Amino acid sequence: MRQFFISMLGTVFGIFVFFILFFFLIIGIGTIAGLSAADQSAGKQVLFMDLRQPVLDHTGAKPIFGAESASVVNIARSLNRAKKDDSIKGLFIRANEFGMVPASAEEIRLAILDFKESGKFVITHSQGFEGTTLTPYMAISASDEIWQQDTTGFAIAGLRSETGFYGGVFEKYDAKPQFEQFHEYKNAANVYTQTDYTDAHRESTNSLLTSLYDSMMAQISTDRKQSTEAVKAVFDTSPHSAEDAKKAGLIDVLGHYNAAREHAREKAGGKSVKFLPITNYAPKGYVTGPVIAFIGGQGPVVTGESADSSNPFATSLSMGGDSVAHAFDMAIKDKKVEAIVFRVSTPGGSPAASDQIHDAVARAKEAGKPVIISMGQYAASGGYYVAANADK
């Protein structure tokens, strides 16, 4: 019995110590967050954006542990606010060197153009565009100066799409894949039923790549103040050295990262200038008055709850019918909410969950709250269905 009470007291003491340590950990996190916010009032600053890190379409609630992940939506918001912030003198970017989703690259480019309307500079440094597609370059092509490390290559060559087909594999095990498909262009199931592209599948893939390529060429040529033909000629004869890319007008300065960073510091005002990570940037003051609610959904549409970036245990992202419908209900009940922006980035998924979200959009409209759709990386199948009933 004595041993039992000793063990019980030890357990209680251990739990007590755990909660004490957890309490001080939370205080520490709050203090660090406060210091990050305080840094924003420390004079002249340059926003720093590292596109080499994974960039989500949008993030969920801010996580308790760890830094908030970069996202396209937060980048656009931060740059739009920073252009009106007198303490922010410019933007310094480290370019992505591996590849980006085309829609994300285009939205980041548009956010940079919006930021530049303030007259503030944008400088980008790359450690080589080697083995990458067009998207990392297009994302930063609107920069005032594009730097590249002189010992690296410029190997951007265009776009490609690869599909693995498993048709015939199931038959070896006396299994037959069965899917419901609506017409020949609904080709998601082809990877399990075919051994190669069908004519319709090949046509849709080529059409998508051609459309993306032409759009990217037009945007890059506008940013670099060159003809589309001249820009295409460079990419069609890739790979190139950094020196040749500079001669072609696609790179402005050859140099290392530290030199580019110090150049940005001098341009902003000298040694006292600090670099502020864009994920730590928060505008000063509070917004009062009417509210526009933001509801986001990314990943496959599923029944039940969403899995988002705020959950440290989530292994993938999903757009849950219950979670999204509940968010709409909250916005409908909130008298301060005048309108709803619904960010959709999904390839589709559960018909039942898609219909649940479609109904939530309809209920918001019936309550007199306009619903505006912002499409992210994709809005296919059920993703387009949930958006179709919106006001715009």
Located regions from the model:
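Extended, domain-scale alpha-helical bundle/helix-rich regions
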Residues: 236-240
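Small-residue-centered hinge/linker elements
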Residues: 1-228, 233, 265-372, 378-392
